[in-house]
Structures are given as structure tokens and as C-alpha cells.
A protein has these predicted regions:
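Active-site phosphate/pyrophosphate-binding segments
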Residues: 571, 581-585, 589, 594, ...
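Helix-enriched interaction subdomains in cytosolic or periplasmic regions
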Residues: 129-139, 420-457, 600-606, 613-646
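N-terminal amphipathic, basic-rich helices that act as targeting or association modules
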Residues: 1-89, 462-471, 475-483, 492, ...
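Short beta-strand segments
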Residues: 74-76, 146, 184-185, 211-215, ...
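Thiamine diphosphate
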Residues: 56, 137-397, 402-403, 487, 635-801, ...
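Non-catalytic terminal/interface segments that mediate subunit docking, oligomerization
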Residues: 382-528, 533-535, 547
Length: 801
């Protein structure tokens, strides 16, 4: 590195010595935790261990340049950085290994994630944003390789937006856009598509991202030569290198064991990103992995003796220690004193954490033993109870699972009889207290989880009939005027106002920062949205067609959908995804993969408006709450006429509430989205045969029918028909499961439910292709007629085809 890239920070020698010794203390503490943590897992006290050994030095250097307001989007090697910032104590480190779920104990995920997955709270216990501009922030880690990349783009771009826009309350989230997103990733994960897509987008957008690539030459057992062209990711990225004439990405390569070189590299990287908003990749080479990849296996299996000897010599902590001694900054005895003190502290923290983990479980064991002793009296020393007491007394290294297995196994042997009433109550109470620890916060649970007041849509006298897309456009106009922190971006969103003109002219009115075009890169469009939402903005990320959501499904599923759950409600990303879908033309422009989305995206609302007025109401509602959601507009409905509301931007709806569109007494027809128009047409035809069908618009698949309209309808019709243009068993299967298990509709049915869906293959092209691939009015009408034929075959003769 040249002198022009050196840090401008000035310290006197004593301050410098103190800082170096603090750094060594941090590095040694982190390693001591890793060593003892691995031992605890191998002893069976934890299920899995993955640690940051070998990455301590670059992380403690990053810590010097990580400022309040900054964000990290990293992975399961970043423990040293969290320790250096005071977010991860030695005790908390072991709480994670032991998966302690006691409230308020394990700070990262409340015991839901394996150790090594870190985060800091972004909201308080009431759901209000913390002052993020004054805090050092860490977005929640996740295990899938490179899954942390897409959101880096949005976290970094948020700084650019806060710098360009003067937003009310902007100081709560940003210091004039001076924040860096610090990204971290392992070398092998750079082979993933998310990595390259993010680097490309960062270079295009010019955002303050500093991405560290920790390169230890391996991806578990696979060497770099089998992972990356030329065996070096920085060589592969040379085409992205910025020049004096062209914007791009600054690429720095530095050895991970060289303390002074790391300081120079990160000083330069931080200054470039923070002041000029230029993305920087820091390729940290010659990293080692002293403990191997994880507790799942030993790296001695695949590394040569020569490689292992080199790793031992170039362990960054050892090199750092040797450098300190060579520079005369500390003596051997001084460093040994630091090491001995840390080893003692870490051992004590481990012991304390283990005792804290076991205490409530031991208490539950004593309670169960007392219950069993009462049960043995009630059953006259029944041998099954005696055996259960013996097994319970001999338990060693157990959790709640083993206690419940003993208790539940015993009560089943008595056919859940009265002898076990007290024991069954104990089981019930324990499950009730424990279930929320493992199953809460899939969705937002604070006062921002639902709109406060429902406002009906209103119309002026003689309100005009307009294309549906005009209703949507003018409603977006009202929303952008009301919400200065609202942004929308996606393919063709800006200049032409989206492919269906729902944003026509709005870029000219509100600017290219708020109404923005993007490249064809669905995964990072979602990543932009997640990152912006984490930083307090209100983004709408547009995926041009529903079929293209599949490009981003991994990011949506693993990151956005699980965010509230995996942080126990401490982080939220109220991203709105706008897309359009269902029937149009061709295999990839008329898909409706709702079943896949419903299974993969629990944690995200999935809203399915039948027209553009309903879509507008959904956007209006979503901006009043803090729940991520996908709104699927009806692709073939933009040119259909709708009445123009006169309270644009204000009317809303209870999300998840279904609506009865047509009353009837003979059967209940349930559907959503574009298909509803066909269902209504079929219901009209049925009426001509004196069959009165009740038509219900679900409006939302997640949440589903929160007002129980379907059960109320079935109480009078006793027949259920679900019409869906997904594949057989797709959304229709999900809807039926929800109704049978959650709403207990089975006793209301006099006939078997009828599911009408699309064919199992992709929809064929053309009008005839649509007719034979998706449910038609004829299909729906005939399926309903057949239900009535079963009831009254004399009045409704059988269809002969």
C-alpha cells in the first residue's frame, strides 16, 4: 500500500501500545472461546460448533474503523468483531452453544440459531426503531453460503439514499449517509451467484460497501483451484476495478496475518467507501483455520502435513504475538499474564453458562419426579411408573425433550386415564411455557402487526370509470406524496413507469432516487429492499412477473421470511414486494407458483388482490404496519375498467380478511386473484339452473380468512369448492388444510370438498393453451354442477363428458 492510503489516525506511542495490547487481548479471548467451545460440543454439551478461529486479526482491525451507524452483513466467522464491540460476552458465547432459550439470556437468537450467528436489536420491545445512527449494527446472520450478500447492497445503498434525500427523522437512521456496510464472506462462497450479482450491482450503484473475503484456500475440503477461476477471487474481479475514467469497485489484497498491512488496507477502504461511496473488496489472503471448518470433521483429513505446518506457523494470532514481541510493545511475561487471565475468565464463563442452562431443566426434572411419585401412589406402585421414576433418576445430559418423552410415554400407557390427570396437566403447562420459545415471532407481533382503523374506499358522485392501472398509478402518487421515505425500484419501473404503466410519470415527479430502474437481477432487487427496510426506509421492490420470483426465492425464504423468527422479533424488515401474475400468455408469463411460495415463504404475507382498487388498499395498509409482504397484482386486469376512488392513499383493509362477493345457499366457491372473475361468471351461469353459489374472495393467502367468512358460509351451504390456477394440490391444498385444521370446517360439510385447479404442467401458450391448462368458466361451472348432481341426481342429471 502507498503512503497516500495510510490511516490519518494519530496516536502517541503509549496509546499505540495500549491499543495493540487491547487488540491482542481480544484476539486471544476470541480464540480461547473457540477452543473451549469446540471442546464443549465434542463433549456433547452442544449440537454443533462453528467458530471464527483464524479470522481474529482482520476482524479486530475492522473494529477500529467500524463507526456508529454502520452495519455488518456477514456470516458465522465474525465473533471477534462482535466481542470487540461489546455485543458478545464470553458467557453469551457459550449460551449460544448450549442453545439456552431462557428469556433474555442468549442475546443473538434466544437460542434459535446455532452459535456463530450474530445480530444486534434494531427495534425496542414495543416495536419502535432504536436510534440506529448512534449504534453499531449487525444484521442477522444466516448459514446458507453467500446468503448475506444481497442485503449488503440495500444496507449500503440506504446510506446513498439518506445522503441524497432530506428525510424527516433521517438523523435517527443515518449520519448524512456516512455509514458503511461491512460485509464478510468466505472465499469458497464467492463461487455463488449471489456474490457476483451483488458485486456487479454495487459497482453500478456506487454504494459504500466494504466487503472482506476471508480466504483460507479451502471450502471445507475443496481447494480454491476447484472453486474459483485462477484460484483467486481478486484476479477474477479485476474487470470490476475502478479507474480514473470509469467507476467500478476498488480491489485490495492483503495478508490476514499482517497487522500493520491490515490497518493500512482497512483505513484506505473505509475512507474511500465512507466519503466517496465507492464499493471496496478487501481480499484477505493467507488466512488459516486452526480448528478446521466446524465440529463436523477434522481438516487433517484433507490437508497435507506441509499445509498444516504452514498454517500453524502463519496462524494470525501467533504472527501478531511475534510482531508485538519483535516491536518491544510487550514482553513475553506480559502477554502470558494476559493469556492466563483470559483462559481463567473463559473457563469461568463456560461453567456459569452451563449451570444457568441446566438450572431450569433440573427444576423441571424435580417437578416431574414429584408428579411421578404421586402417580405411583395413585397406581399402587404400577411397574410402568416405577420404571419411569428409575429412568428419570438415572438421566444424565438431558433436556426438556427427555423429560417430556418420559412423561408422555407414561401417560399413554394408562390410556390417558384419570390416574395421570395431574401428570397430563404438568405436561400441558410445560409445553405451554416452552412452545413460544421455539415458535413465536414468525410474523411481527407488536402493535405494528395490523392496521389501527379500517377506512372504506369512497367514491365521488359520477366518479369516472378508468383503467385499473390508473387507479393504481394515482394511488401510488398519493402514497409517494404522503411518505417521503417510500421508494420503489425494479426492472422498467423508472422511465416507463413499469411495464403496465402503474407508475406512469412518477419518476419525473419524485425523482430517480425514489422511482428507480434496476438491472435484470431479481435476487439483489430483493436484497436492496431487505437492506433498506432494515435501515428504516419503506422500500417497494418490484419483481416484474410472478414467474421471476423464483430467481429470488432463496433470499426471500432464508433471509426475509425467517428474519423476525431467527432474531426473536428483535429485527424487522418491512419490505413490500410488488409483482404481477396469474394467467396471461406463455409458460413463463402466466405461471402461478403459489403452492411453492406458500410453503417456502412462511413469515411473509402473501396478498392476492382481485383488482387494482384492492391492490391499492393493500399497499395503503402495508405502509401502516411493519410486516414484509408480497402483493401479486392481477396481470390481466390493468386495462379493465374500475371506478376511481376519491380517497386515494387513505382507504385500506384488514389484511387477511376475506370478502363475500356473492351470497348463496347451495355451495361456497372460494378463490382469489384473476380467477375470481371466472368464478363469478360461473356462479351467474349456475343461477340460471337455480343453483345459488356463494362466492368468497380470499384476498390474502397469508394470513388466510381471519374473519372466518368461509366457515360462516359453510354453516348454511355445507358444500365447499376451492378454485385455484396453481397446480393440483398447490394453493388449493394449503387452503383446504387451513380450513380443516385451523377452522374445523369438517363437521359443516355434507359433501366432499371439490378442488378445481390448473393442470400439473406449465401453462401452454395461446388462447387454446390457456383454456386447456387453467380452470375455465366451463370447468368451474361443471365442477359445481357435479356437486349438486351428487346431492340431487334427479334434478341435476349427470354430465356425459
Amino acid at each position: 500500500m502507498t503512503s497516500s492510503k495510510e490511516s490519518s489516525v494519530k496516536l502517541d506511542y503509549e496509546q499505540f501500545k495500549a491499543r495493540v495490547c487491547e487488540d491482542y487481548t481480544l484476539a486471544f479471548k476470541s480464540r480461547a472461546c473457540s477452543l473451549l467451545g469446540r471442546r464443549e460440543v465434542l463433549l456433547g454439551k452442544g449440537s454443533f460448533g462453528i467458530f471464527g478461529d483464524g479470522k481474529e486479526l482482520p476482524q479486530l482491525v475492522i473494529n477500529h474503523f467500524f463507526e456508529p451507524g454502520d452495519f455488518r452483513s456477514g456470516y458465522y466467522r465474525d465473533q471477534t468483531l462482535l466481542m470487540g464491540q461489546g455485543f458478545l460476552s464470553e458467557e453469551a458465547f457459550f449460551h449460544a452453544i448450549y442453545a439456552n432459550t431462557e428469556p433474555g439470556v442468549e442475546p443473538m437468537s434466544s437460542g434459535r440459531q446455532m452459535g456463530g450467528h450474530f445480530m444486534t436489536p434494531l427495534i425496542d420491545t414495543n416495536g419502535y426503531w432504536l436510534p440506529l445512527s448512534k449504534l453499531k449494527n449487525h444484521s442477522a446472520d444466516l448459514s446458507p453460503t453467500a446468503a448475506q450478500m444481497p442485503r449488503m447492497l440495500g444496507l449500503a445503498q440506504a446510506s446513498k439514499i439518506y445522503r441524497e434525500l432530506s428525510l424527516p427523522n433521517g438523523n435517527h437512521f443515518s449520519n448524512n449517509g456516512n455509514e458503511i456496510c461491512w460485509g464478510t464472506i468466505g472465499n469458497a462462497s464467492t463461487a455463488e451467484g449471489q456474490f457476483f450479482e451483488t458485486i456487479n450491482a454495487a459497482g453500478v450503484l456506487q454504494v459504500p460497501l466494504v466487503l472482506s473475503i476471508y480466504d483460507d484456500d479451502y471450502g471445507i475440503s475443496v481447494h480454491n483451484k476447484d472453486q474459483i477461476t485462477k484460484g483467486s477471487i481478486s484476479k477474477v474481479l479485476e474487470g470490476f476495478q475502478q479507474t480514473a475514467q470509469e467507476a467500478g469497485v476498488e480491489i485490495i489484497s492483503v495478508k490476514g496475518w499482517d497487522y500493520t498491512a491490515l490497518i493500512k488496507a482497512y483505513s484506505y477502504a473505509a475512507k474511500l467507501a465512507r466519503t466517496a461511496h465507492i464499493p471496496v473488496v478487501v481480499h484477505v489472503t493467507e488466512i488459516t483455520q486452526p480448528l478446521g471448518h466446524s465440529t463436523s470433521g477434522s481438516h487433517e483429513r484433507y490437508k497435507s502435513k506441509e499445509r498444516l505446518a504452514w498454517e500453524k506457523e502463519y496462524d494470525c494470532n501467533l504472527q501478531f504475538k511475534n510482531w508485538i514481541l519483535q516491536q518491544g510493545i510487550a514482553t513475553t511475561s506480559e502477554l502470558e499474564s494476559i493469556e492466563n487471565g483470559i483462559n481463567t475468565t473463559v473457563r469461568e464463563a463456560k461453567t456459569k453458562a452451563w449451570k444457568l442452562h441446566n438450572a431450569p431443566i433440573l427444576k423441571a426434572k424435580e417437578q416431574l419426579l414429584a408428579e411421578l411419585q404421586q402417580t405411583v401412589k395413585l397406581t399402587n406402585n404400577n411397574p410402568n411408573v416405577v420404571l419411569a421414576i428409575k429412568n428419570l433418576s438415572e438421566l444424565d445430559g438431558f433436556g426438556y425433550k427427555e423429560l417430556l418423552e418420559i412423561a408422555r410415554g407414561l401417560v399413554s400407557k394408562f390410556y390417558f386415564g384419570k390416574e395421570t390427570t395431574a401428570l397430563q396437566q404438568w405436561i400441558k403447562n410445560l409445553k405451554k411455557s416452552l412452545n413460544p420459545r421455539f415458535s413465536s415471532h414468525l410474523y411481527t407481533q407488536d402493535h405494528y402487526s395490523q392496521i389501527a382503523n379500517k377506512i372504506e374506499v369512497t367514491y365521488a358522485e359520477n366518479a369516472p370509470q378508468v383503467d385499473g392501472r390508473v387507479v393504481l398509478r394515482d394511488n401510488f402518487d398519493a402514497l409517494f406524496a404522503q411518505h417521503p421515505d417510500l421508494l420503489i425500484f425494479g426492472e422498467d419501473v423508472g422511465k416507463i413507469g413499469d411495464v403496465n404503466q402503474g407508475l406512469e410519470g412518477l419518476q419525473n415527479k419524485y425523482g430517480a432516487t425514489r422511482i428507480a430502474d434496476t438491472g435484470i437481477r431479481e435476487t439483489t432487487i430483493i436484497g436492496q429492499g431487505i437492506g433498506m427496510a432494515l435501515r428504516g426506509l419503506r422500500p417497494i421492490a418490484e419483481i416484474q412477473y410472478l414467474d421471476y420470483v423464483l430467481y429470488a426465492i432463496q433470499t426471500l425464504s432464508d433471509d426475509l421470511a425467517s428474519l423476525s423468527y431467527r432474531t426473536h422479533g428483535k429485527q424487522i424488515a418491512p419490505l413490500i414486494i410488488r409483482t404481477r401474475g396469474h394467467r396471461l400468455e406463455g409458460i413463463w408469463h402466466s405461471g402461478s407458483p403459489m403452492g411453492g411460495m406458500l410453503h417456502l415463504l412462511r413469515g411473509i404475507y402473501i396478498l392476492t388482490p382481485r383488482n387494482m382498487t384492492q391492490a391499492a388498499a393493500m399497499y395503503n395498509s402495508l405502509l401502516q404496519i411493519k410486516q414484509p409482504a408480497i402483493v401479486i397484482e392481477s396481470l390481466n386486469g390493468y386495462r379493465l375498467k374500475e371506478t376511481m376512488p376519491d380517497n386515494l392513499g387513505a382507504f385500506n383493509m384488514i389484511l387477511g380478511a376475506s370478502e363475500v362477493l356473492r351470497s348463496g345457499t347451495d355451495l361456497t366457491m372460494v378463490s382469489y386473484g384473476s380467477t375470481l372473475r371466472l368464478v363469478e361468471a360461473a356462479a351467474q351461469r349456475l343461477q340460471s339452473l337455480d343453483i345459488e353459489a356463494e362466492v368468497i374472495d380470499l384476498q390474502s393467502l397469508i394470513p388466510l380468512d381471519v374473519n372466518k367468512s368461509i366457515a360462516k358460509s359453510l354453516a348454511k351451504t355445507n358444500r365447499l369448492m376451492i378454485i385455484d390456477e396453481d397446480v393440483p394440490g398447490g394453493a388449493s391444498g394449503y387452503i383446504l388444510q387451513q380450513l380443516i385444521e385451523e377452522q374445523q370446517i369438517y363437521p359443516l360439510l355434507d359433501s366432499a370438498p371439490k378442488l378445481v385447479s390448473a393442470k400439473a404442467h406449465r401453462p401452454a401458450y395461446g388462447t387454446d393453451g390457456d383454456y386447456f391448462s387453467k380452470p375455465s368458466v366451463d370447468d368451474i361451472f361443471e365442477a359445481a354442477y357435479k356437486m349438486l348432481h351428487e346431492v340431487n341426481p334427479q334434478h341435476y342429471p349427470a354430465i356425459q363428458f
